[in-house]
Swiss-Prot record:
Membrane topology type: Multi-pass membrane protein
Catalytic activity: Release of signal peptides from bacterial membrane prolipoproteins. Hydrolyzes -Xaa-Yaa-Zaa-|-(S,diacylglyceryl)Cys-, in which Xaa is hydrophobic (preferably Leu), and Yaa (Ala or Ser) and Zaa (Gly or Ala) have small, neutral side chains
Species assigned in the record: Moorella thermoacetica (strain ATCC 39073 / JCM 9320)
Pathway assignment: Protein modification; lipoprotein biosynthesis (signal peptide cleavage)
One annotated GO biological process: proteolysis
GO-annotated cellular components: plasma membrane
Upper lineage: Bacteria, Bacillati, Bacillota, Clostridia, Moorellales
Keyword Transmembrane: yes
Compartmental location: Cell membrane
Transmembrane segments: 59-79, 84-101, 117-137
Protein name: Lipoprotein signal peptidase
């Protein structure tokens, strides 16, 4: 799947999921989905992961724009035979843009996935984390074992 199409798909799914939560839940409302293990809990996150740096929206917007530019530049210079690296960048870009839109529209990020033992997060956060994991995995592999197309 082309890089920008995947990033846009991640962005669209993220924004649709947040729209569904915003229109069907009140802030701080929680719905058990799988017993006491998994809930849908609508929260406003004005900070970063774990609520760090709350209410620093301008900082987050600036950093996110810079990260998006770096991702696009990295993609431009990435060899075409590195599909897993391309996947990682698309996931990170789509997730970063999803949270950026929230910050620009609302001044906070909409979070709703609640595992009860971890801070509440969203699909954009998941895309970013999976993208970073794939990126690290690919960069740490010996050159001959990296996910290159034959």
């Amino acid at each position: 799947m082309p890089f920008l199409l995947l990033a846009l798909l991640v962005l669209a799914i993220d924004q649709l999921s947040k729209y569904m939560i915003r229109t069907n839940f009140q802030p701080n409302e929680s719905l058990p989905v799988i017993g006491s293990f998994f809930h849908l809990t609508y929260v406003h996150n004005p900070g970063a992961a774990f609520g760090l740096l709350a209410n620093k929206t301008q900082v987050f917007v600036g950093v996110t724009v810079l990260v998006a530019i770096i991702i696009l530049a990295a993609y431009r210079y990435l060899p075409p035979d590195r599909p897993l690296l391309r996947l990682s960048l698309a996931l990170m870009l789509g997730g970063a843009l999803g949270n950026l839109i929230d910050r620009l529209r609302f001044g906070y990020v909409v979070d709703f996935l609640d595992l009860r033992i971890w801070p509440v997060f969203n699909l954009a956060d998941m895309a970013i984390v999976f993208g970073v994991i794939i990126l690290c995995w690919q960069l740490l592999l010996p050159a001959g074992e990296q996910g290159r197309e034959p």
